[in-house]
Amino acid sequence: MHVLVADRLTCSRCGPEFGLILRADQTHDRRVTEGVLGCPNCRDQYPITDGFGDLRAPPRSELPKGLAGDPVIRTQDESEYLLPLLGITRGPATVLLIGGPTVLGPGLAALLDDIHVVGVDADLARWPTDPSWSRIVSHPGIPFFSRSLRGVVIDGRLDRHWFEEAARVIAPMSRVVVVNAVTTTSEWLQAAGLSIMANESGRVVATSS
């Protein structure tokens, strides 16, 4: 986990108004491989193990099955289509991938300088440590400050709450991209305050004002 990503994380128990304090036990090139993220409000601690951050609010049980699956190697070309959908041409930028799209994380991170890619999915705990991006799991929402991210790519198979959270965390004039979109996707995004830019071939692009 990159230290600049850790600075943007918030407490899943207390809510997005409460930032976390990083205790880095083991780092390399500004990446935390072992450590703890602590909340000064509720005193809860979120572990970072092998670079993977568990940002689930307590009580924490065994990790559930995610949507990313086993580790795979994807090329930059397979991730390239995301950049025009996100409307990002240069950094600095922090982009969040949730669910199935997290498999494109390393490829996306390699496309631009000064971009921080964060994947959110329980299956990423089994993925090897990769300095090009950050891996976390979270519950019940997205553990980032409101209006702080340049873009979110989200799996359309997820519950409505995740779409509301995606709308909350993107910065003004930024976009949410949905892959594996379903019939209710556009309705959910609009109800969350976003405007639909495109809806085609199982992908929906929405923007904040």
Residue ranges and their predicted role:
Residues 21, 56, 66-94, 101-107, ...:
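Conserved alpha-helix/loop element of class I SAM-dependent methyltransferases that forms part
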Residues 100-104, 118-127, 181-184:
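Short, polar loop motifs at secondary-structure junctions
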Residues 187-209:
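Core SAM-dependent methyltransferase catalytic element
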Residues 92, 130-156, 160-164:
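A short acidic, Gly/Pro-enriched loop at the edge of an enzyme's catalytic core
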Residues 1-65:
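N-terminal auxiliary segments of SAM/dcSAM-dependent transferases
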Residues 93, 115, 174:
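Glycine-centered, small-residue-biased loops immediately flanking beta-strands
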Residues 89, 112, 168-172:
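A generic alpha-to-beta junction signature in SAM-dependent methyltransferases
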Residues 160-177, 181-182, 186:
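A short glycine-rich, Lys/Arg-flanked "PGG" loop and its adjoining helix->strand segment in the class I
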